[in-house]
């Protein structure tokens, strides 16, 4: 195999996104070499491209983007025995580097030294060939497509968020933001027994998609609307009731505030979206009504559950993909994502395999 056949999407610095050939890596003992098939573009990929950083994570050297992927095992390291060439797998992008207190507690996503694809300085898998720890590659049932395998990553965010939110049978759930993560939270909320799910967004096209995918109510957020006005619309839609659990997926201050005002006393607000480092919130409202605010950082222990949910047809994530591009069209795909067109943009890394 020629050593220049690994086409990769590489971010050099802010606004400097390139397609380039890199050497095909060799798997270490506990790794597999994957021939990538489908990789979704995440908002964080675009944020790194546009800003060169997310918080303290700064792009200081060229980095391969992408952390929502699936592919086929091409080669296995000598220490790998549960996977073989030809196996179709979904990739969990976060791999603990050490067995610290967070790992011992089963919350390895909180480990400060975790390897995470496409978080500086760690390379992602928006490329044709990628090596990955075999224990974080999960076999896909024949009934699931590569695209569904790639969508397990954003689905995992929603599973973790809904777990953190304590959603159960009969819950009234508010979701702020109808992008990929908002839609995934809609699907998981309903699968976990929510009786009513209300979703808000600025874009009518996204709300239409949310309605098609099972939202009970949708609300179009107006640009000049106050957080109290939005929360009142939410209460009106719920027939005067308030949400048991609110899941904020935008990071926008207005939506965080509205989530607090629209959540019942003793309820839970889950913060999934990330935008600015800080936000003004009505702390008195939180305190006197005992609203629990819970953060979400990625996920942990979700891939097997997600695969079971998809294989059992408990949820259908396929309609989330609205745009597809070849790997060679990566820049166009990133521009499409940046414009907020559609929901999920998917890149196809293996043009010889048309199986979605």
Model-derived regions: residue spans:
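C-terminal hydrophobic helical "lid"/dimerization subdomain
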Residues: 1-4, 8, 257-261, 300, ...
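Glycine-rich beta-strand-centered segment in the early N-terminal region that forms part
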Residues: 25-39, 54-101, 141-143
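NAD(P)H dinucleotide-binding glycine-rich loop of Rossmann-like/cofactor-binding domains
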Residues: 97-176
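Adenosine-nucleotide cofactor-binding segment
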Residues: 175-178, 190-256
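N-terminal Rossmann-fold NAD(P) dinucleotide-binding loop
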Residues: 182-183
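Glycine-centered, small-residue-biased loops immediately flanking beta-strands
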Residues: 267
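Rossmann-fold NAD(P)-binding glycine/threonine-rich loop
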Residues: 273-289
